[in-house]
């Protein structure tokens, strides 16, 4: 699926099996995973690289010292996300952030580290903690710096319409280091949500 944005586009896709990914990978993509010993990490990287290739066939990737991907010889910005069985890539003209998550993940275990009482009061939906986590992950990726505190440096201040997993789309307003940032949330299917900066 492709979601157009004012600054570019966000694509999301299921992660294919390892054999399909490796047989379809370019030599450069295979070199990029040569030192990765974890099979799941290799698959995740090959999956998002394949999705990026479908969005921008000539895109070349390099990695910053913190491991964040960057497009070589391009002014475009990239953000990537993956969960166990799904991958997302945001590609655009300005810094961006994207996060995809499975809804069966237990977000309540760590909610006290990222979900403030005022944020919790914004929505009563059972998946609201997942939405806030995704939004803050997307904001973190957009920020592109170390030492960001998910409570101090970013806040979700509004959601419209109220989160409704039947309707499947909503608009979020956040503050990142005091600056307003808009995000979109999307229910991909019964098991996944996607949030990206606008």
Go through each PLM region and give its residues.
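Core catalytic alpha/beta fold that binds nucleotide/phospho-ligands
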Residues: 1-198
């Amino acid at each position: 699926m492709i979601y157009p944005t004012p600054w570019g586009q966000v694509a999301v896709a299921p992660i294919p099996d390892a054999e399909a990914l490796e047989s379809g990978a370019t030599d450069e993509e295979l070199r990029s995973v040569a030192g990765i010993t974890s099979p799941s990490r290799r698959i995740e990287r090959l999956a998002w690289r394949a999705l990026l290739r479908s969005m921008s066939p000539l895109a070349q990737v390099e990695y910053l010292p913190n491991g964040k991907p960057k497009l070589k010889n391009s002014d475009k910005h990239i953000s990537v996300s993956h969960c166990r069985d799904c991958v997302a890539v945001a590609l655009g003209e300005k810094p961006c952030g994207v996060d995809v998550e499975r809804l069966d993940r237990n977000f309540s275990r760590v909610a006290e580290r990222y979900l403030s009482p005022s944020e919790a009061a914004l929505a009563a939906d059972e998946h609201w903690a997942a939405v806030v986590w995704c939004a803050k992950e997307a904001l973190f990726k957009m920020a592109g710096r170390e030492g960001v505190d998910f409570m101090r440096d970013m806040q979700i201040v509004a959601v419209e319409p109220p989160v409704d997993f039947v309707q499947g789309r909503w608009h979020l307003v956040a503050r990142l280091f005091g600056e307003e940032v808009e995000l979109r949330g999307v229910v991909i299917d019964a098991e996944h949500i996607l949030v990206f900066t606008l």
